[in-house]
Design a protein with these regions (language model features):
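A short, solvent-exposed loop/turn motif at the edges and junctions
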Residues: 65-67, 89, 93-105
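Structural motif
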Residues: 43-54
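Residue-level detector of Asp-centered blade-edge/turn motifs that repeat once per structural unit
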Residues: 291-294, 340-343
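Short Pro-Gly-centered beta-turn/loop motif in secreted/extracellular proteins
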Residues: 52-55, 81-89, 97
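Extracellular beta-sheet/turn segments enriched in Thr/Pro/Gly and aliphatic residues
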Residues: 34, 108-131
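Short, acidic Ser/Thr/Gly-rich low-complexity loop/linker segments typical of extracellular
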Residues: 63-79
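The canonical Cys-X-X-Cys-His
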Residues: 155-166, 213
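Conserved beta-propeller blade signature
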Residues: 296-299, 345-348
Length: 372
């Protein structure tokens, strides 16, 4: 969600929430939205432990037992305003890079409620970097000498095509540790992520620069003092801070085969201090999204699983309905690209159809949930 903050569009945009296993909608800002009579208006103020008003802080609210999270941003005076919400119990939290998150259980009733936050400044740089985006990690990597600049380019061009830089750099290893990782990754199939075994010829660029790159990474993300120069991105302000973000938590396709929290990923990116989520807890596979003519969100799943080929997310309730197209060996056939035609029919590219072929086209009618 942090990567969305500087977007200035105030109308609805549909996208996958980058590192957070979910789907998000941007909507009109709270101050420009038409007045609503029903529901409770939650507002408050956010300041630092020094008393400074904090602009651009992300404040989020999630109703108890629900899967929908709504987030707004503080204005130039440190104040925030949610659109009116249903009464009930909520978890409300405020986050800004460089600060501990503030969390509170809030019961909303009547016409309005208030929750203020005081955020404590983080003193340890190791705590700060856990909150950083991939872009911020790459920016922080040193390039003050020709050798370091070259190694930064090698890292960016070689190690960030399939996963976020933050997923790699949130960890710290000494030089032998980084070299061991490079030895492994040099024999991993690009794109698929499968280890090809020791007999596969290593990726030439990684093999050639392995020792130099291991030295560079150990200096930046090793056990000793770091060469990184941390510079956090400015928080949103002005029009960008008037956006409202709605996130929908998507359950794991196969929760029995993965660590989970009541069927959801144990870390979905909600709390930045937990670091970048890992696909190892099942939070991967969502690929393309499309909004249908009823305002619901459809998405494809590209990773092998037993129940999900394409899915519909009800944007009013957050409920996810899965459609399984039989694939190979009892699995659901994976899907990749997704488009919608003028008639509202969805089309997806499908892999692993038992009928054979390298790929097939899947058609889904959102009105009937039938496919062919």
């Amino acid at each position: 969600m942090k990567n969305m903050m500087n977007r200035k569009q105030l109308w609805v945009i549909v996208l996958i929430a980058a590192t957070a296993m979910g789907v998000a909608l941007f909507a009109v800002g709270a101050k420009s939205a038409p007045a609503q009579q029903a529901g409770v208006l939650l507002s408050g103020a956010v300041k630092s432990d020094t008393g400074a008003k904090l602009e651009g802080v992300t404040v989020s609210a999630k109703a108890e037992g629900q899967t929908i999270t709504t987030s707004v941003f503080t204005d130039e005076d440190g104040n925030y305003y949610f659109p009116r919400m249903a009464g009930g119990k909520y978890l409300v939290w405020a986050q800004a890079e460089g600060f501990d998150a503030g969390k509170s259980d809030v019961s909303l009733s009547g016409t309005s409620g208030r929750q203020d936050f005081t955020l404590n400044t983080l003193k340890d740089s190791q705590d700060i970097v856990k909150q950083m985006t991939g872009q911020e990690y790459v920016t922080a990597l040193p390039e003050d000498t020709p050798q370091r600049r070259k190694m930064k380019d090698v890292f960016y061009n070689t190690c960030t095509g399939c996963h976020e830089p933050s997923y790699i750099l949130q960890n710290r290893f000494d030089e032998p540790g980084w070299e061991a990782i490079l030895n492994l990754m040099s024999r991993v199939y690009n794109g698929g992520g499968e280890y090809a075994g020791p007999d596969m010829a290593p990726f030439p660029v990684m093999a050639y620069y392995k020792k130099e790159l291991a030295t560079y990474l150990a200096e930046a993300r090793g056990p000793g003092a770091s060469t990184m120069q941390i510079k956090l991105r400015p928080r949103p302000r002005g029009e960008a801070a008037r956006a409202i973000v709605t996130e929908y938590a998507v359950p794991i396709a196969d929760p029995d085969a993965n660590p989970n929290d009541d069927g959801f990923p144990t870390n979905d990116g909600t709390f930045w201090s937990m670091g970048t989520p890992s696909a190892l807890n099942g939070s991967r596979g969502l690929h393309d999204t499309q909004a249908d003519h009823n305002g619901n969100i459809w998405f494809t799943t590209s990773e092998p699983n037993y129940k999900r080929t394409v899915s519909m997310l009800d944007t009013k309730t957050g409920k996810v309905t899965d459609i399984k197209v039989p694939g190979l060996n009892g699995l659901a056939a994976p899907t990749h690209g997704l488009a919608i035609d003028p008639a509202g029919v969805l089309w997806a590219t499908m892999i692993g159809d038992p009928r054979g072929g390298g790929g097939n086209l899947l058609r889904v009618d959102p009105a009937t949930m039938k496919y062919d």
